[in-house]
Amino acid sequence: MAVFKLSPSAIGLFMDCPRCFWLDRNGTRRPDGMFPSLPGGMDRVLKEHFDRFRSRDALPPELERAGFKGSLFRNQPLLDDWRDRFRGLVADMPEINAVCRGAIDDLLVDEDGETLIPFDFKTKGTAPTEGYEDHYHHQMCIYGFMLEKMGHVVG
């Protein structure tokens, strides 16, 4: 039997619309929405901004102003892999014959120096819709689950 492939976006689709998920898995894909270049470009700019601070082992001022006491994840080559949609995070779940793959934007490390905190840049071209917090919360939980399956401590 083939391994069932999941991703944070596929799980989000299931949570939003189980029928849409079933249709997607059975050959009727949802049409792709327009992907505006501004949010995609901002995502890249934010990653580069955080990477500059990471290379100096410093926190970006946005995190300092928010009172964050930890640090940025320091392993840039590993983070680059985890950001890549073809390599990304991989959580094998042989007990249910499934694998979950996803690409993360960034990681923070709690002040204990061990606990990883998934971090995602939200750069939407429009105002957030009602209930967006739940969607993003679930997305971060899925990234946390994947990191735990990979052997990391997650907060």
Feature locations, PLM:
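Metal-dependent nuclease catalytic cores that hydrolyze phosphodiester bonds in DNA/RNA
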Residues: 1-115
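Mg2+/Mn2+-dependent nuclease catalytic core
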Residues: 83-155
